[in-house]
Amino acid sequence: MKTLKTIALGLILLATFGAANAATKKANNEILTVNHAVSTYINAMVHGQVSDLSAVIDQKAEFTMLRGSKMLSFNKTEILGSVQQNENVEQACTTTTSVRESNNDLTVVKVDMKYEGFTRSNYVTLANTSEGWKITNVYSVFK
């Protein structure tokens, strides 16, 4: 009888801690929504608030910029290094966003940064990963 009580107690504890762990994972995923990821990207690029940017970028993310006829490519580490150099620097631009495509697995958001004399259009692709919505690709064009 004592063994049966011990086994029952063990199963109850296992179920309790398993449910608590699942709730923690869900809460973290709710933080990584499309809106959170895009807002974090904009805050880093426009306002120099870089503290949360790494969390919303996928490890294999690619960043591509077309400047005139020149194509520049960067990975996550390189883009984070570049953004860190502009920490707390406020860009002199106005920003607008528009969702170009969205479904349960993928979202593409256009982020326009309008400066005096030119506009930088960023096409931000986000994927719904097991860790929440992550930026997987950013393609930037200067007009």
Question: Where are the regions that the model predicts?
Answer:
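Surface-exposed, charged secondary-structure patches
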Residues: 29, 77-118
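Short, well-ordered alpha-helical segments enriched in acidic and aromatic residues
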Residues: 48-60
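Short, low-complexity N-terminal intrinsically disordered segments enriched in polar/charged residues
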Residues: 3-8, 19-47
